Regions:
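Conserved, mostly hydrophobic/aromatic
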Residues: 1, 92, 150, 211
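Acidic/polar loop patches that form or flank catalytic/metal-binding clefts of enzymes
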Residues: 1-5, 28-34, 96-107, 124-128, ...
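Solvent-exposed beta-hairpin/edge-strand motifs
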Residues: 167-181
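C-terminal beta-strand-rich structural cap/linker in extracellular carbohydrate-active enzymes
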Residues: 195-221
Length: 221
């Protein structure tokens, strides 16, 4: 069960493990009718609401808008912030039953993004909090088996975030990295995909656009 239109979890899923997720959150659907500050909410909610249990935020918007372009439109809704902000949400937000909020044809057109979303597990074996500040930005690394995923989000302030890869065990890894594109402040759908080799002794810096993020999948070589 995924309980939508529901208050935050309070132990029901402990007694009934078939209850996989709860709404109880100002989810992405609110962008259809209001201009709440969603990027700021996205870097606040995980520290508060998500502490109570899984959250069905329904991420995955492919129609993305910068701060000064966004408008609440019911017929053709858009998300606040960048495309990579949406991708990173799948790593950051915990929900054993995840959703794709947008039109199926959007995912067919955006194959790289769709493949990344499909690769992110819905449950993990290990969580490692990284550089974060409530209401400002956050980053987290999560492990499933031998694979790691990193998600980072920022509010409307563009910033550079540092990812310390010391959470990785010894060895060499391939990281598939999605970062905000050079034009993401104006065209929020703009992103850059790269593949790099990383080890546990590396520390890398990534620029996040206004309402942006970083998303990566790390596989052992």
């Amino acid at each position: 069960l995924d309980l939508h239109g529901m208050f935050k979890p309070s132990g029901l899923n402990v007694c009934y493990p078939n209850v996989l997720s709860f709404e109880g959150v100002r989810g992405l659907e609110n962008c259809k009718w209001h201009n709440y500050d969603m990027p700021a909410y996205d870097v606040t909610m995980p520290f508060i609401r998500m502490a109570a249990g899984p959250v069905d935020y329904t991420p995955g918007a492919m129609n993305n808008a910068s701060r000064y372009v966004f408008r609440p439109v019911t017929q053709q809704p858009m998300s606040m912030g960048t495309r990579v902000h949406q991708l990173a949400s799948y790593v950051v937000f915990d929900s054993p039953l995840q959703m794709l909020c947008d039109s199926p044809t959007f995912y067919e057109r955006n194959v790289d993004c769709t493949r990344f979303i499909a690769s992110v597990p819905t449950v993990f074996d290990e969580y490692v909090p990284l550089q974060s500040k409530v209401g400002k930005y956050l980053s987290v690394a999560k492990r499933k088996g031998d694979e790691w995923f990193v998600g980072a989000l920022t509010n409307w302030d563009k910033r550079t975030i540092t990812i310390d890869f010391s959470f990785l065990p010894a060895g060499t890894y391939k990281a598939t990295v999605f970062t905000d594109g050079i034009n993401a402040d104006r065209n929020a759908t703009d992103y850059r995909k790269t593949e790099i080799t990383v080890t546990s002794d590396m520390v890398l810096k990534y620029d996040m656009a206004s309402g942006g993020g970083v998303a990566m999948r790390i596989q052992k070589l």
